[in-house]
């Protein structure tokens, strides 16, 4: 049976040190019957060494490919109409429900939405009434741009993005990409009551902490992140701490 939505996790061996937390938190919070695709570079000698769950569908990409080509490589093997996409350092900290994700996909399909970001910002919520989700205090908001992840993409739109555009992972939100997405029907979802304090950690569809920004730990933004990583015996002392990345809310 073809799932309505699947999860695609893009990874790189350079950040494999974060995988224990990603896998542990996914095992803890994501419903077991969610289809998960794990995309990693072919320079890794033994993926089994990293204890990636057996039921995750594993794909490799060639290291010399640009980011959009790496991701585009896997679309033919994903059959779901919608894809929840994230990179390896966006760590879930709350329930990731298959039922809720499927209900959200139904809303997207009924309204011809192409993309739904898992959180928003008070600069958006302060200027719109929003559309009630059916879940207390959570509303959908129209967006005129995109933040790449974690977000639900219509499969065909995500594939078009990665086919038409030729981008590195540091360029996938540049002006050309923003212009492309402004021609699509893009939305966001947010808890209106907590948008000023907890917009990513209180996400309806993928509560999370973004562990790394520009290669530095996001301990300033997420004070509880270090304790979480320490619980997975991840070395948090070998790189610095980011001091300014989106500190207005968690």
Named regions from a protein language model:
Residues 20-24, 69, 97-106, 170-179:
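Well-ordered, non-membrane alpha-helical segments in soluble/globular domains
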Residues 80, 111-114, 185:
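Short, high-confidence coil segments that cap the C-terminus of an alpha-helix
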Residues 164-250:
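C-terminal catalytic/acceptor-binding lobe
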């Amino acid at each position: 049976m073809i799932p309505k939505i699947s999860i695609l996790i893009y990874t790189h061996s350079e950040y494999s040190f974060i995988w224990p937390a990603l896998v542990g938190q996914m095992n803890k919070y994501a419903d077991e019957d969610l289809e998960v695709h794990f995309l990693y570079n072919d320079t890794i000698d033994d993926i089994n060494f990293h204890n990636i769950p057996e039921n995750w569908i594993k794909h490799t990409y060639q290291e010399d490919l640009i980011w959009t080509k790496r991701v585009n490589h896997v679309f033919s093997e994903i059959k779901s109409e919608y894809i929840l996409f994230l990179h390896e350092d966006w760590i879930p900290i709350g329930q990731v429900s298959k039922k809720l994700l499927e209900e959200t996909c139904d809303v997207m399909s009924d309204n011809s939405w192409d993309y739904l970001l898992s959180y928003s910002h008070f600069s958006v919520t302060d200027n719109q009434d929003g559309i009630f989700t059916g879940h207390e205090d959570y509303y959908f908001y129209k967006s005129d741009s995109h933040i790449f992840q974690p977000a639900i993409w219509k499969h065909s739109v995500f594939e078009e993005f990665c086919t038409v555009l030729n981008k590195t992972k540091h360029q996938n939100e540049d002006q050309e990409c923003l212009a492309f997405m402004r021609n699509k029907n893009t939305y966001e979802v947010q808890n209106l009551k907590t948008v000023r304090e907890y917009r990513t950690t209180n996400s309806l569809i993928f509560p999370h902490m973004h562990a790394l920004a520009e290669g530095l730990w996001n301990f300033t933004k997420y004070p509880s992140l270090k304790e979480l990583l320490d619980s997975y015996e991840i070395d948090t002392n070998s790189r610095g701490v980011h001091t300014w990345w989106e500190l207005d809310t968690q």
